[in-house]
Amino acid sequence: PDSVDSVSGSSGDWIVEANFGSEQLADGFEYVNDGETISINMHTDSIEDAEDINIVGVRATLTYSEDETSSGIGCNAPGASNPDPDTITSTMVYNEMNMTESGQNSDGPPSSHSVEVEWYDSSMIGNVSNVSKSQITMGLDSGGIGLGAYALDISVSVGTGGAIGCTHTDDGEDVEYLVELITLEYLSLIHI
């Protein structure tokens, strides 16, 4: 293989390896009422030397359990006290880019889902043909995109089970969130 420097301007075939990392932007807990949407606002100013990081995306992971309660004599019937799942929806927003994902909780271990927004050219990773080194770099170097304000919107739509003589109550859910910037930390280019 040729050295990268000797072929930086020529088009050709490349093996491109990229190592991704993450940088925590925010985390916390919020109680979200049924039908409510809360917005969590964040900014990369909270990260030291953020301008030196190649930010290529953002990921939010939400974790939640079921807290539906039931009461009444009818709850002794088989299945009457089983909760109905709630739908937890998250929208990750950066500039004009956004993505929405939903998940449902269950009566058991905590459930979770993630939502990601990315702005790098994933076709420039792996075996890449007929491009120059500078085209690869342009596709994978964010050039400062990723700095600034972010928002995570979380909403809950509860489902309540129940049966005759068994009343269910579910006003919302406790939602834990973790927001991470996706970083491209290292790039290896081999001209083939």
Q: Can you name each region flagged by the protein language model?
A:
Residues 62-68, 94-96, 156-162, 181-185:
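Beta-strand elements of well-folded, non-transmembrane domains
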Residues 34-119:
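Acidic, Ser/Thr/Pro-rich low-complexity intrinsically disordered segments
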Residues 55-57, 130-165:
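Noncatalytic modules at the cell exterior or secretory-pathway interfaces
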Residues 1-28:
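N-terminal leader/pro-regions and domain N-caps
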Residues 190-192:
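Conserved small/polar residues in nucleotide/adenosyl-binding loops
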Residues 33, 51-53, 143-147, 172:
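Surface-exposed coil/turn segments at beta-strand junctions on protein surfaces, enriched
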Residues 22-29, 98-147:
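Extended, solvent-exposed segments with strong compositional bias
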Residues 150, 158-186:
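Edge beta-strands of jelly-roll/beta-sandwich modules across compartments, strongly enriched
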